[in-house]
Each structure stands twice: as structure tokens, then as C-alpha cells.
Swiss-Prot record:
Cellular component terms (Gene Ontology): cytosol
Name this polypeptide is given: Translation initiation factor IF-1
Major location (coarse): cytoplasm
Source species taxonomy: Bacteria, Bacillati, Actinomycetota, Actinomycetes, Propionibacteriales
InterPro entries, sorted: NA-bd_OB-fold (IPR012340), RNA-binding_domain_S1_IF1 (IPR006196), S1_domain (IPR003029), TIF_IF1 (IPR004368)
Gene Ontology molecular function: ribosome binding; rRNA binding; translation initiation factor activity
Superkingdom of source: Bacteria
Gene3D superfamilies cross-referenced by the UniProt entry: Nucleic acid-binding proteins
Length: 73
């Protein structure tokens, strides 16, 4: 998995599934972010459901949106 330069990776829990493959994720520190699935997860048909533990990659420029890069088993 390629890491983005300067991106923050935080762990959280999916709170709700939204339309267009978007998810509301509550991070460990209590913040809620809007996240979408990364391209590789979409390619391999990895399904994400509410209450799944995930790793979210956040850009330092916009900390309210992120990309889900890993789903814990």
C-alpha cells in the first residue's frame, strides 16, 4: 500500500453509510469525518458496514474529509 506524502492515518469506526460510497467515520479522538473508499478497496469489492473498524487517511489541508484505506478483520 503506497503512502501519501504528508497524509495522516487515523483509526476509527464507521457510524453510518451514506449514498455514493461515502461513510461517516468517528475517529478515536472523537472527531467525525466524511470518508470515501480508496480505489483499490473498490476494485477488490471490499464491503464496509456500519460498526466496522477502519483506517482513514486524512489530508493535512482538509481534516473533515478522508479516504478509507484499510478495514480491520
Amino acid at each position: 500500500m503506497a503512502k501519501k506524502e504528508g497524509a495522516l492515518e487515523l483509526e476509527g469506526t464507521v457510524v453510518e453509510a451514506l449514498p455514493n460510497a461515502m461513510f461517516r467515520v468517528e475517529l478515536k479522538n472523537g472527531h467525525r469525518v466524511l470518508a470515501t473508499i480508496s480505489g483499490k478497496m473498490r476494485q477488490h469489492y471490499i464491503r464496509i458496514l456500519p460498526s466496522d473498524r477502519v483506517v482513514v487517511e486524512l489530508s493535512p489541508y482538509d481534516l473533515t474529509r478522508g479516504r478509507i484505506v484499510y478495514r480491520h478483520k
